[in-house]
Amino acid sequence: MARIVVLISGSGSNLQALIDAQKQGQLGEDAHIVSVISSSKKAYGLTRAADNNIPTKVCSLYPYTKGIAKEDKAARAKARSQFENDLAKLVLEEKPDVIICAGWLLILGSTFLSQLQSVPILNLHPALPGCFDGTTHAIEMAWRKCQDENKPLTAGCMVHYVIEEVDKGEPLVVKKLEIIPGEETLEQYEQRVHDAEHIAIVEATYKVLQQLHK
């Protein structure tokens, strides 16, 4: 069985795409989501997982940094490292073949990545390679750039391998979308991106699992 661990922070719409794909055999015959780990106990994605009998865990950064002043960078870095170490332990307990960051909003640093070197980690980013790296506002930034420059813009989303440099890992699946000035609202473009993300995350998961089993 191919074991998938999914990391989330919010509504879990991309998690739902993976759950639906698993039911339809689109991730591979033996692929199963064995755990969903959320950085927020309020994430609706936890409900989605529970509704589909997928075990869940919560690993929030807040308890680690609570009470530490933002100016105390050394203490915050130490707390962050402890958080990543504990997160890595939770993930490793599941013996994953692949880890999918599906709307996971926290940067995975060296403490986490060094313990998961043998496991491919994928991240969904709502922009093309080299565009709007390291921001959670990539969709709005692309749409506004198109409107401000008043000319068509090719944007989209990608699924890439996670490395220490944020959003700089090798792209696995890229979906391009054309934005035309004045043709759609930000909300309409955002929906197009999300629709493309749901396809991309399934394709990327299937692709990496097929490569692992060659």
Curated annotation (Swiss-Prot):
The keyword Kinase does not apply. (6R)-10-formyltetrahydrofolate binds at L105, L106, I107, L108, N123, D167. N(1)-(5-phospho-beta-D-ribosyl)glycinamide binds at G12, S13, N14, E197. CDD domains: FMT_core_GART (cd08645). PROSITE patterns: GART. The keyword Manganese does not apply. One of its GO terms (cellular component) is nucleus. Transmembrane segments: none annotated. Pathway: Purine metabolism; IMP biosynthesis via de novo pathway; N(2)-formyl-N(1)-(5-phospho-D-ribosyl)glycinamide from N(1)-(5-phospho-D-ribosyl)glycinamide (10-formyl THF route): step 1/1. It comes from the Eukaryota. The record marks D167 as: Raises pKa of active site His. GO terms for molecular function: phosphoribosylglycinamide formyltransferase activity. It catalyses: N(1)-(5-phospho-beta-D-ribosyl)glycinamide + (6R)-10-formyltetrahydrofolate = N(2)-formyl-N(1)-(5-phospho-beta-D-ribosyl)glycinamide + (6S)-5,6,7,8-tetrahydrofolate + H(+). Induction: Induced by amino acid and purine starvation in a GCN4 dependent manner. Signal peptide: none annotated. The active site is at H125 (proton donor). Keywords: Purine biosynthesis, Transferase. Its EC number is 2.1.2.2. GO terms for biological process: 'de novo' IMP biosynthetic process; adenine biosynthetic process; purine nucleotide biosynthetic process. PANTHER family: PHOSPHORIBOSYLGLYCINAMIDE FORMYLTRANSFERASE (PTHR43369:SF2). Present with 3910 molecules/cell in log phase SD medium. Belongs to the GART family. This is Phosphoribosylglycinamide formyltransferase. It comes from Saccharomyces cerevisiae (strain ATCC 204508 / S288c) (Baker's yeast). The lineage of its organism: Eukaryota, Fungi, Dikarya, Ascomycota, Saccharomycotina.
